[in-house]
């Protein structure tokens, strides 16, 4: 979702700076480096451009525009995050999933929660997801790498992720294999 502060991004397509501005009264718009409005349309919220697209909010729903200000992914989502590695996290009917830059669903909106990582939620190519109060991990194609069986989990760092099961801590690798069993009181 949009940050209430100004966000700047270098547009790869136009080689000019596009600044996303969100005002306290719920108006979002884009300006160039000299403060000139870039698009006629204003939104309820905006985010910076990543991979040539920016999140925009219209009628309380999120979608994406290109660097010409054209809506290329309709504003149909309850929430959205910026693109990274060709994917954007989106929310529909209180569930999270991922779409690609064409607006195609890559990972269906079936997860209650996702990693808190700012952009898409992927770390070491995996996203932490929650279903029915349990955590697991999926890859960028939506394949379950570690099933949602953990009471708690943290994002991957250097190939390992902290997991907790039955009040005991351990670690799994990026293949979902347990490398340190959940037998420890803390990590």
Identify what each model region corresponds to:
Residues 2-187:
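Residue-level detector of conserved, function-critical positions
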